[in-house]
Amino acid sequence: MVSAVSDVRYFWHETPVPAGLEVTQVYGWLLCPRTGRVLVQDDDGTFNLPGGTPEEWDADLTATLVREAFEENQVRVGETAYLGYQEVHRPGRAPYAQARMAGVVEAFAERAPDPDGGRVYRRLMTSLEAAPGVLGWGEPAVLQAGAAARVARARWRLPVDSPSEPGYVD
C-alpha cells in the first residue's frame, strides 16, 4: 500500500525490515486486554501511537517500544508482536523504516511528564476500527490496525471486535 503526504511516500509491508534499511521509529498498537481498545496518545489534540526512536542501549524493537510507552504514557507493556514496517521515501534522504508492533497493556501507572520534553500526554482508548481516523494517517494506518486486530484475536484472544466505548484513562 502506498500513501503520500506532500512529497513523502509511505509503503506498508507485513514483513521483516530488510537488512540495511535504517529503523528510525518503533510505534505500538497497545491494547487493553479487558476492553479491547487501543491506546492513542493525545498531545493537546495531536494524536499519535506510543513509541519513539530506537536508542543504542535498547536490546531490540520490543525494548524500544516498552521503554517509550512507559516514558510517554506510563503504561507497562506485556506481550508484544511485530506487525511490519512502514517504508518512508522522503526527497533528499535515503528510504528508511518505521517499525510497527502490537502489544498488551498490563498496567496503567499514574500519568507523569515525558522525560524527553516534559509533556504529559492524555491516554485515549478507542477501537482499532476508529483509531486510524483519529490518527489521520490514511490507508497505511487502516492496514496496520488490521494487522494488530489479527494478532490480538489469534494470539491473545482480545475482544477487539466488540470493544467498550472510547474514553480517556487519565
Regions found by a protein language model. Name each.
Residues 1-27:
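Acidic, metal-coordinating catalytic segment for phosphate/diphosphate chemistry
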Residues 116-170:
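Nudix hydrolase/Nudix homology domain
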